[in-house]
Amino acid sequence: ADALGIAAASLTKDSMCANCHGTKAKRDGVVSVISGVSCESCHGPAQDWLKPHGEYFEGMAFKTLDQLRTDREKETDEHRAARLKAVSKAGLIRPKQIHTLARNCLDCHLIDNEKLVAAGHKTASAFELVSWTGGEVRHNFFMNKDDNAAAPSLWMKVENRTAAQRDRIKLAVGTLTQIEMALDRRAKATSPAYIPQIGGVVAAANGKLAQIS
């Protein structure tokens, strides 16, 4: 921030740093940081989807998590399909949208701001989709509040698929997405400080893909 002349007072407002290190909201026409990295950082701004994404039938009223689990059992296939389509349209990045989720992660973990990198910021985190979404960020408590499941409940309970299947998909899609975005950034790069670093990201991701295949 100092190297780019970003004032300390702006760090909790509408600064580029807060794009990744915080969650912004507009209140009374003023943009400010309301929290650190949050649900919305991964799943997208929640204003339009937060309520409907947990409504399993018309007229449903949220009471407790136990009641929510019971209510989800009553949801019809038709309602579920319509609900998931609607919340995706409203901006929710769902766990099943692995490519979109990976791109959203890499928007912060693979820097495209060449001035920021030239000022000393790292081009990339040691990001890997499987491990980074399976660590402290994992939050699959819907079916059991005491058991952080290895994969989302819809994936395992409704689609009858396993956590291992999901991890294999995440490994391949995450690596391909890293190559996709790094190549795009390399094609647009002009900074002598940025070009070799983003080129290194491409090479590393390509090597990982070769190991996978």
Feature map (PLM): residue ranges:
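Primarily the internal scaffold of c-type cytochrome electron-transfer domains
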Residues: 1-4, 26-37, 41, 45-213
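Mid-chain, structured segments of secreted extracytoplasmic proteins
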Residues: 2-30
